[in-house]
From Swiss-Prot:
Matching InterPro entries: Fert-Immune_med_protein, LY6_UPA_recep-like, Snake_toxin-like_sf
Cellular-component GO terms for this entry: plasma membrane
Originating organism: Mus musculus (Mouse)
Phenotype of gene-disrupted mutants: Mice are viable, fertile and are born at the expected Mendelian rate. Slight decrease in blood CD11b(+)Ly-6G(-)Ly-6C(+) monocyte and CD11b(+)Ly-6G(+)Ly-6C(+) neutrophil populations. Lymphocyte and myeloid development is not affected. In S.aureus-mediated skin infection, recruitment of neutrophils and monocytes to the infection site is transiently reduced. In thioglycolate-induced peritonitis, recruitment of neutrophils is normal.
Record Pfam families: UPAR_LY6
Bilayer topology term: Single-pass type IV membrane protein
Assembly and interaction partners: Found in a complex with integrin ITGAM/CD11b and ITGB2/CD18. Interacts with PECAM1 (via Ig-like C2-type domain 6); the interaction is Ca(2+)-dependent; the interaction is direct. Interacts with serine protease PRTN3/myeloblastin; the interaction tethers PRTN3 to the cell surface; the interaction is direct.
Protein name, per record: CD177 antigen
Keywords from the UniProt entry: Cell adhesion, Cell membrane, Glycoprotein, Immunity, Innate immunity, Membrane, Repeat, Signal, Transmembrane, Transmembrane helix
Length: 817
């Protein structure tokens, strides 16, 4: 995405620091005129109240081509820092020449008051005719049958290309033919942006062309009195062959309506604009608009709700009364209303929307008319454009808050009962809260595994299960799933599971005693309690609910065999398995294990140490892996790494991926999957840096962006830094990473260069990590705060063994002025 706001909807405001907002002149224009008309003047610019901290900008560009000149004017609000008036000649001729004027001010309202091209100095110097002849054209339409001109002396080549101009109110493909003093498609001398005007050129017009499409997504709930709505969008350059799509859905429910809008690039076949009325009332009504096109840039240009909505006819009230709600939040305060005549049933359900940048769970309660009651608000529709739609009438309509976190620890039994506190998380609508606790007693030690969080499992009353009671090793678990209230998974102590074991006389069997995620070599022997007849030696693997553990266990048992858990394979969300192959038969694979996150600067230049403090034994279908992700935005860098066992079924492989590079941010990864003993042993980030290209750092350009990388929490940087030349827009987004023992959300701000794509492209996995990217236009309700670890202030740390429970993030809001 570019730096233009993805969607601006009238009436939307934001809480910002208490600084007066400026009023700026607001207008944009593009036109081809005769040079003889210069200097040109303009008047009648509108006015716009900016966001707090924004300034006013003036931007003018003139492209001279013989007797013709193309004029671009942009006035309005901008986040760019103040800039004194600056005139730059991008090309001086002979032949085609380009000059620009830019200024950003904050010293007073309407300070962007330039109203003439006179500010751009003198016209190009007259020249003597030469011998070269070239077509002459400046047109927004076509250059067919363009007249020829005699080029000025010094012109050596004919230029023929399309200049794409993209800015606030400017969406132009300017056809240009004329004289130049050099070959190649370089009319702009490498310039890609002038202020907030983004530019590119294309001189290869044979074959499929990459379209520019309006792009963005929006979800809003409003009063019907706000209709009709209008909007503007951002834009993106598609891959060759892709088309532009737009999808709008309106749900009206009484005096409220819900609107979902998504636009962008697609590989779908062309579809003429189609209006579908999925439900017409009385009561709830639903209409959608779908369009896919390839006939021109920005052909997905619907900008108003006019085609979708007409005021419904007045209807008499009936006798049915239903609760009324249309909300992406809560329906707790929904009121009961009298339905219009013809309504036969009350609807209550959750409409889930996924796709096209839309992630929403809309709670709907209202009146409908249908022959049979049921969960069929959309009359069987399952997709609307790129959006998958699903409804569920069996879920509660409010998202629960649950205690959230994981813990693994080995303690002396004398310390029982243990207590803990947990973080919290907002679940998806329909999910419940779960508590899972497992205790394994072995002599004087106890292994505790705890996981809390959200779950899709059905409600389950608190249940204590004794999987093995001893003598010797004993295993007990506690599981519960609830939805009756927020934070109902409130287990905070081992007390419900544990009571001091009865005193038993010692027996005659002696066995090694071990609890470890590392190794059990040279484990001390213990005298087993009476009744113990065999020694147990195995590896207990736990996977699920945020738990990844391979626990080596040696101790006393009252029966032979590899059956510590008496056949149990799942405990809550955790899958459990055990392996007891004797040493002579073992084919166990050991891998280094640990998670690294480090924040600093210069990581793209100098290697960072990357070693693991421990190892683990993998399951039979797992191999070793190491994954390293580098994010370098210029002034700040971050490394995130994982070593351990892979997901089941992985194959040997080594790879380096570069997702983004200079002149924008550098985002790259190193991954290795291998199947020999401790083969994931890279000890520094040089395994990645040694392969990355080392281009020369470009000189500073014209674009300024905030630069930030945050591993825990959101970027709050407001200071802008000048981007390298070639960067054309600012990026702001989050990347959620999960896997390999790491769960975090990385917040990123920085410079980006064309093509305008997500930072990770289409990548959903990075080695062992699953990755989900969301940019700054994503709906706020869809984002949950990244959990904060108890030792966040240590900017470099390894997570191994005992995991701290997670705590919530809170943010302050400045009062309105």
């Amino acid at each position: 995405m570019n730096s233009i706001p993805v969607l601006t909807l009238l009436g939307v405001t934001a809480l910002l620091p208490c600084v007066p907002a400026l009023t700026c002149q607001k207008s944009s224009a593009q036109a081809v005129r005769n040079v003889a008309e210069l200097p040109l003047r303009w008047w009648g610019a509108g006015e716009k109240t900016c966001e707090v901290s924004e300034g006013c900008q003036d931007l003018i560009m003139l492209l001279y081509n013989g007797p013709k000149v193309n004029l671009v004017i942009i006035k309005g609000c901008t986040e760019v820092e103040d800039q004194e008036p600056k005139v730059i000649w991008l090309r001086t001729g002979p032949g085609l020449s380009v000059v620009s004027y830019t200024r950003v001010c904050r010293h007073g309202d309407l300070c962007n008051d330039v109203n003439s091209t006179k500010i751009l100095e003198e016209l190009p110097t007259p020249t003597v005719p030469g011998s070269l002849r070239c077509p002459l054209c400046l047109s927004n339409d076509s250059c067919e049958n363009a007249p020829e001109q005699v080029c000025p002396v010094g012109s050596t080549h004919c230029y023929d290309g399309v200049l794409r101009l993209r800015g606030d109110g400017i969406r132009t493909n300017l056809k240009v033919q004329g004289c130049m003093a050099q070959p190649d498609c370089n009319l702009l001398n490498g310039t890609q942006a002038i202020g907030t005007l983004y530019m590119s050129e294309n001189c290869d017009l044979i074959g499929p062309q990459a379209l520019d499409c309006n792009s963005g997504s929006l979800e809003t709930v409003r009063n019907v009195s706000d209709l009709h709505l209008s909007w503007t969008t951002g834009w993106q350059t598609c891959e060759a062959g892709e088309g532009c799509y737009e999808t709008v859905m309106l749900i009206q429910n009484g005096h409220e309506f819900h609107m979902v809008l998504t636009k962008g690039c697609t590989r779908d076949m062309n579809k003429k604009a189609r209006l579908t009325r999925h439900r017409t009332g009385p009561g709830i009504s639903i209409v959608s608009y779908v369009h896919v096109c390839r006939d021109r840039d920005f052909c997905n240009d619907l900008s108003t709700t006019d085609p979708l909505w007409t005021p419904p006819p007045d209807t008499e009230l009936g006798t049915l009364r239903c609760r009324h709600c249309l909300s992406t939040g809560s329906c707790v305060s929904a009121s009961e209303l009298v339905c219009p005549a013809g309504s036969t049933h009350c609807y209550s359900g959750v409409l889930s929307l996924r796709g096209g940048g839309v992630i929403s769970d809309l709670k709907v309660q209202g009146c409908i008319s249908q022959s049979q009651p049921g969960c069929n608000l959309l009359n069987g529709t399952q997709t609307i454009g790129p959006v998958d739609v699903r409804e569920d009438c069996g879920l509660q309509l409010d998202a629960l808050k649950c205690q959230h976190g994981t813990l693994k620890t080995i303690q002396d039994i004398s310390k029982l009962p243990l207590q803990w506190t947990a973080g919290q998380k907002i679940c998806n609508v329909g999910e419940g809260c779960q508590d899972t606790l497992m205790l394994i007693e072995n002599g004087e030690q106890v292994n505790l595994v705890l996981t809390k969080g959200c779950t899709t499992a059905k409600d389950q009353e608190a249940k204590v299960t004794e999987h093995r009671t001893g003598p010797g090793l004993s295993v007990t678990s506690y599981t519960r799933v609830c939805r009756k209230k927020d934070f109902c998974n409130d287990l905070s102590t081992t007390a419900p599971l544990w009571a001091p074991p009865p005193v038993t006389a010692p027996g005659t069997t002696r066995c090694p005693l071990c609890f470890s995620e590392q190794a059990c070599e040279n484990a001390p022997e213990q005298v087993c309690p009476a009744g113990s007849t065999h020694c147990y030696s195995g590896v207990l693997s736990l996977r699920g609910g945020g738990i990844i553990s391979d626990l080596k266990v040696q101790g006393c048992m009252s029966q032979p065999g590899c059956n510590l858990l008496n056949g149990t394979q799942t405990i809550g969300p955790v899958d459990v398995s055990e392996r007891c192959s004797p040493p002579s038969e073992t084919t166990e694979l050991s891998c280094y294990r640990g998670v690294m996150f480090e924040l600093g600067n210069g990581f793209a230049e100098e290697p960072v140490k990357w070693t693991a403090p421990g190892s683990q034994v993998c399951a039979p279908d797992e191999i070793c892996q190491e994954t390293l992700l580098l994010i370098d935005v210029g002034q700040k860098s971050a490394f995130l790494g994982s070593k351990g066992c892979s997901s089941p079924g992985a194959q040997d492989n080594i790879g380096v991926s570069i997702f983004s590079r200079l002149p924008g941010m550098l985002v790259a990864s190193y991954t290795k999957f291998c199947s020999s003993h401790l083969c994931n042993g890279a000890d520094s980030s040089s395994v990645l840096l040694s392969i990355l290209p080392r281009p020369d750092v470009p000189p500073p350009g014209d674009v300024q962006c905030p630069m930030c990388v945050e591993l825990f929490g959101s970027c709050k940087s407001t200071d802008s830094v000048t981007c390298p030349r070639g960067a054309t827009h600012c990026y702001k987004g989050d990347i959620a990473l999960q896997g390999g023992g790491l769960t975090t959300r990385v917040s990123i701000q920085g410079c980006m260069a064309p093509p305008i794509k997500p930072l990770l492209g289409d990548s959903k996995t990075i080695g062992i990590f699953s990755a989900e990217e969301s940019s700054n236009y994503r709906h706020e309700d869809d984002v949950t705060s990244a959990p904060s670890l108890a030792w966040t202030l240590r900017l470099s740390a390894w997570m191994l063994g005992l995991s701290a429970l997670l705590s919530s993030l809170y943010a302050g809001i400045c009062p309105l002025c």
